Amino acid sequence: MKITAEMIKDLRQKTHAGMNECHKALQQTEGNIEKAIVFLREKGIIKAAQKQGRVTSEGITNIVFAGNNAFLYEINSETDFVSKNEHFQQLVKMLGEIILKKQLSNVKDLLAFNYQNKTVQELLFEKTSVLGENITLKRVLKVTKKPQESFGIYKHQGGRISVLVVLKNDCPSVSEDIAMHIAASKPQFLTPDKVDPTFLAEEKKILHKQAAKELSDKPAQMIEKIIENRLGKMLKDMCLSEQPFVKNADQKVKDYLKANNTDVVYYVRWEMGN
């Protein structure tokens, strides 16, 4: 029997299941809507569909890499308990293998990818049914380095925070230390000259407004000096190169890197849920 778009639409409205699931259910039941509903219930798909809108505020970030390419990805669940479940952990590993093998660098392509006769979206749907919580893929990012550069990776609390660093050369111990520093210190920019001009202009505007209230009795030249000092202190806290190194507070990160004849080309810090 031919399965029409109208039949699929009708079943979707009744069950809130996905289009592919509805199409398969109708094929299995020769177009019988009532039997298709029973089929979806038996597969646990209707329950999973009902969970799809629920908030996923827990989960795991992870990093996989091979050669010159690395990928960060985040998978979410509703509770921390489920994110530690063996089924969830297996899903994280499986998605990492798919991402790396097929070099998939965005959520849309990954969800649509067919793995063992099922799309990744359908696999997530199945896990939602098994685990009893909404399971979602939040984001994917690809980072490519030059052949002479190296990756450094650090994961905190089993993937609640994941950091990827690209160094200009191969320094395994340094890359791990810097990745750990970034996880702890949360720098927003690599160096002062890499600060987003729009962000800088906005911060200066805020500092000027604050100074106008606090320092109205001071000369304009002094106010400008105070603003520049405050801005400098803020950038010191926000720029990786200017931060005190987490393993030696007397040494700036840039000095630690210089002492080891290397430098950070790029970094990314992901925190679960952010």
Curated annotation (Swiss-Prot):
Pfam families: EF_TS. GO terms for molecular function: translation elongation factor activity. Residues 79-82 are annotated as: Involved in Mg(2+) ion dislocation from EF-Tu. The lineage of its organism: Bacteria, Bacillati, Mycoplasmatota, Mollicutes, Acholeplasmatales. Associates with the EF-Tu.GDP complex and induces the exchange of GDP to GTP. It remains bound to the aminoacyl-tRNA.EF-Tu.GTP complex up to the GTP hydrolysis stage on the ribosome. Keywords: Cytoplasm, Elongation factor, Protein biosynthesis. This is Elongation factor Ts. SUPFAM superfamilies: Elongation factor Ts (EF-Ts), dimerisation domain, UBA-like. It is found in: Cytoplasm. The keyword Transmembrane helix does not apply. Belongs to the EF-Ts family. HAMAP family: EF_Ts (MF_00050). Gene3D superfamilies: 1.10.286.20, DNA helicase RuvA subunit, C-terminal domain, Elongation factor Ts, dimerisation domain. Its main location: cytoplasm. GO terms for cellular component: cytoplasm. InterPro entries: EF-Ts_dimer_sf, Transl_elong_EFTs/EF1B, Transl_elong_EFTs/EF1B_dimer, Transl_elong_Ts_CS, UBA-like_sf. The keyword Magnesium does not apply.
